[in-house]
Amino acid sequence: EIRLSLVGSEMCIRDRANGGTVTFEESHFVVQPQISFSVMEQSTGYVKVLVGGRGDKNTDRGLNRATDDVARQPGSSIKPLVAYGPGLDTGAITLASAIDDAPYYYSGTDARLVKNYTEGEYLGYITVRAALTRSQNVPAVKVLTQITPAVGFSYLQKFGLSTLVSPQNAVNGNHDVVQSLALGGMTKGVSNIDMTAAYAAIANKGVYTKPIYYTKVLDSEGNVIIDNSIPETHKVLKESSAWLLTSGMESVVSSGTATRAKVSNQPTAGKTGTTQFDTDIWFCGFTPYYTASIWVGYDDNSRQVSSVNHTSIWRSIMEQIHSDLPSGEFTKPEDIVEVQVCSKSGKLPVEGLCDHDPRGSCIITEYFAADNQPTESCDTHVKVNICNVSGDIANTGCTSVSTRILTKKPSSDSIGSNDSGYTTRDAEYSITEDKLTKLCTLHQRASTSSTNSNSGSTSTNNSNKNNSTTPTTSASGTTNSSGSSGSTEKTTKHN
C-alpha cells in the first residue's frame, strides 16, 4: 500500500494579464510508508550506507530518517540489548535458562498484564533461546526484572543509544528505567544509526565503535586538517556473551520471526521489532562483515497493513553488498562449551524424567560460557502417582493409580488460573507445588506401609483420620502426586 501525505504548499505567480494575477498551488507530497536504512562495517565502524527515506530528493539538507532526531519506538529489537545481552553478560541467565512464559504483571503502580505479540498465548517453560527466537514478551520482561531495569539501562548507555531518558532527566515524569523497557517502551525512542551501531558492537565481539562517516578532511593543498581515522571504542559485552547472543539471534533468522532475512552464503543473526498497531517495524541484524538496520513506518504514526516485507528488503540490500564476499563465520571463542541440559529447567538432565516427558524428550544440547555452565540437576520434572478417581496424590488405599511425569510450577498463577483469564500451553503437563502435598482423601489407606516400586516413593501409614499424610520424594525427584490431565506413563491397580 502506498499513500501520499501533503507536507507543504507554495503559491506561485503563473501569469499576469489585464492587470490581474493568476495563481496556482504547487504541492509537494511524501510517499508513505517511509523507510530508513543504515549499514556499518563492524570491524572498522565505517558507515557504508545511509538511506534517509523513500522518494525523490527535492530539497537540500532535508529530513534524514536514519540519522536525524527522528526517534521511533524499537519494539522487540531492543530485547537483545537491554535484557538478553546483559543477562548473559552478568551470568544471570544462559541460553538454556528456562523461563515460565505465563501470565505476569508489571510491578508497582504499573500493574498491567504483560501480553505476548500473539495475544493470550503463553507457552509455559521456555528456554531463553526459544523465547528470543519466538519473540515472546513475558520472558524478556522477567529477565530485565531479574537483572533490574537500572542494569539494562546502563547497558543501553554503553551500546551508544543517544536518546535515553534517565530518571534525573525525566520528561513529564517519564523515564526509561522501567520494566517495559524490555519491550521497547521508551520515552523518546531510538534512531536507526544508533541501533545499527549497537548491533555492530555485538557483531564486533562485544566492542562498540562510534560510527565513522569520514576519515579525514583536507585543505586545498592536501593537508589533513581533521583526522577522524582513529575509531572511538569501548567494551560492552564479554566476547563469550556476544557470541552466545549472536548464536541466539541466528536462531531468530533460521527458524524464528526473521526467516526472510537470511543472507545467501552468509551466517546471519538479528532481531525483529514491531510496535503496537505496527506503527514501527524494525529488523536489526548482521553477518560476519556488515551490520544493518531497517525501519519502516508512516511519518504520522499511522497503522501499517503488512509487516513482512521489511526483512526481505533488508536481505535484498545485504545480498548485493555481500555478492563478491566469501562465506564468513562467527568465530566461536575458546571458552564456549556444549552441554546437554533439560529444556524445562536449564539444568543437567535426570535420566528417567527429563527424557520421559510426555511431550517427548526434553534433553537438548546448548552452548554455555565455560564459567557459567550448569552444575545442578533438573528439579522441575517430577514423577507423580495420581489417584484416577480424585485426581489427588495417590495413597496406598487408592485402587486406580496413574504414574505421570510432569513439570513442577510454584503456583496456580503460573499456569494461568488467575484473573488474567489465560492458560499456558503446558498447563496439562504441569503440577503446582501445593498439589504435590495434597493426598487423596476419598480412599482409606492400606493398613500397612507400602512402597511404590514404579516411582520410588513411599507412602507411610498412620492413624490420621483425614488420610492426609505428607508424601515423600525420592532422590530422583519422584513423589506420589496429583492434579494434571497429562499423559499417563503407567497405570496400576492395588487389590
Where are the predicted features?
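A penicillin-recognizing enzyme superfamily signal
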Residues: R3, S9-E10, R14-E41, L50-V51, ...
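Short active-site loop at a secondary-structure junction
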Residues: V30-I35, N58-L81, A96-I99, I126, ...
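Ser/Thr/Gly/Pro-rich low-complexity, disordered linker/stalk segments of secreted
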Residues: R445-N495
